[in-house]
Amino acid sequence: RWLGTPIKTPRPSVPLASTIQEVDWISAAFLLVKKRVLEKAGLMDEDFFLYAEEVEWCSRIGKQGKLCIYGDLSAIHLQGEAINKDQQSNEKGYYGLYSRKDLQLMMSNHLRVRKQFGVGWFLFLLLNYTWGVLVYTIVGFIHRLITLRNPFGHLGKVFAFGKNVFRIWTLAPTIVRNKPHFYKLL
């Protein structure tokens, strides 16, 4: 954000607006789409089980015209917590790496990148996650040494992260082929 704002990178989502604001995607919790746009862009992709489906859909809708939020309208949306209760997770947000919920989030984001940007970007992202496991292992080890903690204390998280990345690798051939498949991992 500190880099994107000065170079006028479009914001993908805007938490609060007072006027009409153009965006790259809109949360599907409150989304209105014209019928003629739906006929051209299609409905939400059924390959997605949870997460990232509206981002991919908005990328197709955006090819038909602008996506905007209207600042003079409002809706009250309470944060959903059902998935956290089901998975016994206390995490808020969408940035974990270790749990089954995080695996579903990673899978959906990789699938979205494949559908939205193609095989090359999908593989680039997957290779970065794979490299990330090694980096996380080494940096975690060094950090725990410097802070005088057990240098192997983070290995449980390393293995959980690695397991999640490996699971995406097992589904990579299916994702690359881009054939219909329901990616439910929870």
Residue spans for each PLM region:
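Transmembrane helix-loop junctions in multipass membrane proteins, especially transporters and channels
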Residues: T5-S13, F141, L145-F152
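Short, flexible, basic/aromatic active-site loop/helix in glycosyltransferases
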Residues: R1-V23
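Active-site-adjacent helix/loop segment of glycosyltransferases
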Residues: K63-R149
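Short capping/connector residues at structural and topological boundaries
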Residues: K8, A28-L31, E81
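Aromatic-acidic/polar surface patches that form glycan- and anion
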Residues: E22-S27, L31, L50-Y51, Y98, ...
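A short, conserved alpha-helix in the catalytic core of glycosyltransferases
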Residues: P15-T19, D24-S74
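Structural element of the ATP-grasp superfamily
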Residues: L38, I61, N109, V113, ...
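Membrane-interface aromatic/basic loop that binds lipid-linked glycans or pyrophosphate carriers
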Residues: R144-L186
